[in-house]
UniProtKB/Swiss-Prot annotation:
This is Probable Xaa-Pro aminopeptidase pepP. Belongs to the peptidase M24B family. It holds the Pfam family AMP_N. It catalyses: Release of any N-terminal amino acid, including proline, that is linked to proline, even from a dipeptide or tripeptide. InterPro entries: Aminopep_P_N (IPR007865), Creatin/AminoP/Spt16_N (IPR029149), Creatinase/aminopeptidase-like (IPR036005), Pept_M24 (IPR000994), X-Pro_dipept-like (IPR052433). The keyword Metal-binding applies. Gene3D superfamilies: Creatinase/methionine aminopeptidase superfamily (3.90.230.10), Creatinase/prolidase N-terminal domain (3.40.350.10).
């Protein structure tokens, strides 16, 4: 089996991706020739400033090119199976400041394309293709992602409605190269999570832990973060997407360290994401209450990962996580009553309000999940993926139990749900905040491959935090 670095030494498989997308467009062509036209993100300046806006390549363009250059474009002639990349011409003034850019010859060696030209040749190339196909060809592009100066004269139709969806559905199933990129992002992020946990031993503020994570990512080749890191100490962990990352780790009243830290963070490697969450104690060991909740959440995750395989119904996996949570909270005495009744009444949503996971790829919340945020069933409303998981998809498995007053208190005020919650026992757990454990898992034909190797057993975590 080839190593990650050996796989990534080859070119990004842009041509294979173009063919995959073209297959999805075939029903819309009615037997006519067709082309795909995509543009890269433009260079833009910050308002009232001469500094550029931080660059993030358009994902549809990257998927069919592997190219991170701004102001570029591509044309894929579906009939001729010919992929052409257009890169900006040399700007002598820019060379003074930034050096010589990539040449067309260098780009041809670097990217999986058939031809490289400069962007001033886009319109003449499009006209030539349209003429070669006798004016019958369809031009597929994405609405609001085409420059005004780009012309599609001579094409029988300009279709702006189907390409985006075709690319998004194609992205669900990853190839070997994409899996290697996600695995690489995970490997780097594992080092960063370990560094962050170790930094907490002497840290005094959440931002120091965040800094250790980001610095380790950059040092290992992941210059960008897949998303803004979440570093939440104490009760901050009850906020799902807490982002302030600036609280002191010492409680101002007790003058003692808060119980634990939830860190949800992932580096991005060559546009592909990782998304990993861990919870660790401040002061070496988990408190009794935090450890109890941690072990329930870990059991939720372990059992759900074991259910993964080609064709598994994601809603069933999510529901199973709730059953494990209910059993654990019943054992602790936080919940009371029957497991089935608590499940049917959706009381566990008070403690586990979000979906079990989402697709992962070039976006943290990757495309193709078909969520239904209008679902009236609170247990499934925030599930970002619906339906069966195909082999080759990468999904996060991130169960959690949270003690968020804003979410739980309405359940305590409701006669329908309050009878299932023991408030005296619950009182001991507010300071736990929240526990979430998240891994990135590849679905295979007969099972799964967990791409995340970050330590997560109680013993492993406590050893790092001591």
């Amino acid at each position: 089996m080839a190593t990650v670095d050996a796989i990534l030494a080859a070119k990004y498989p842009a041509k294979a991706h173009a063919r995959r997308v073209a297959e999805r467009l075939q029903p819309h062509q009615d037997g006519r020739p067709g082309i795909i036209y995509l543009e890269a993100q433009k260079t833009r300046l910050i308002e009232d400033n001469d500094e550029p806006v931080p660059f993030r390549q358009r994902r549809p363009f990257f998927y069919l090119s592997g190219c991170l250059l701004p102001d570029s474009s591509l044309v894929y002639d579906i009939t001729e199976d010919k992929l052409t990349l257009f890169i900006p011409p040399v700007d002598p003034e820019d060379v003074i400041w930034s050096g010589l850019p990539l040449s067309t010859d260098e780009a041809l060696q670097q990217y999986d394309v058939d031809r490289v030209s400069i962007t001033t040749e886009v319109n003449s190339t499009l006209a030539s293709i349209a003429s070669a196909h006798g004016g019958r060809a369809v031009a597929y592009n994405i609405a609001d992602q085409v420059s005004p100066e780009t012309k599609f004269d001579g094409f029988s139709e300009i279709n702006k409605s189907v390409l985006k969806g075709a690319i998004e559905q194609s992205r669900v199933v990853k190839d070997e190269y994409e899996i290697a990129l996600i695995r690489k992002a995970n490997d780097i992020s594992t080092k960063a999570h370990v560094a962050a946990i170790k930094a907490s031993i002497i840290a005094e503020n959440e931002r120091e832990i965040e800094g250790a994570f980001i610095a380790t990512c950059i040092a290992n080749g992941a210059r960008e973060q897949a998303y803004h890191p979440i570093v939440a100490c104490g009760e901050n962990g009850a906020t799902l997407h807490y982002g302030r990352n600036s609280d002191a780790l010492i409680d101002p009243v007790t003058k003692k360290k808060k119980r634990n830290v939830l860190i949800d963070a992932g580096g991005e490697y060559r546009t592909y994401c990782s998304d990993i969450t861990r919870v660790f104690p401040l002061g070496g060991g988990f408190t009794t209450e935090t450890r109890q909740i941690y072990e329930i959440v870990l059991q939720m995750q372990v059992e759900c990962i074991e259910m993964l395989r080609d064709g598994v119904q994601w809603e069933e996996v999510h529901a199973h996580a709730h059953h494990v949570a209910i059993r654990g909270l019943l054992e602790l005495g936080i919940l009371r009553g029957s497991e089935d009744e608590i499940f049917e009444k959706r009381v566990s949503v008070a403690f586990f309000p979000h979906g079990l996971g989402h697709y992962l790829g070039m976006d943290t919340h990757d495309t193709g999940g078909n969520p239904n945020y209008a679902d009236k069933d609170t247990m499934f409303r925030y599930l970002r993926v619906r339906g069966r998981l195909p082999a080759g998809s990468v999904i996060t498995v991130e169960p959690g139990i949270y003690f968020c007053r804003f979410i739980i208190e309405p359940y305590l005020k409701s006669s329908e749900s309050s009878k299932y919650i023991d408030t005296d026992v619950l009182e001991r757990y507010w300071s736990v905040g929240g526990v979430r454990i998240e891994d990135n898992v590849l679905v295979t034909k007969d099972g799964y491959d967990n791409l995340t190797t970050t330590p997560k057993t109680v013993e492993e975590i406590e050893s790092l935090a001591a």
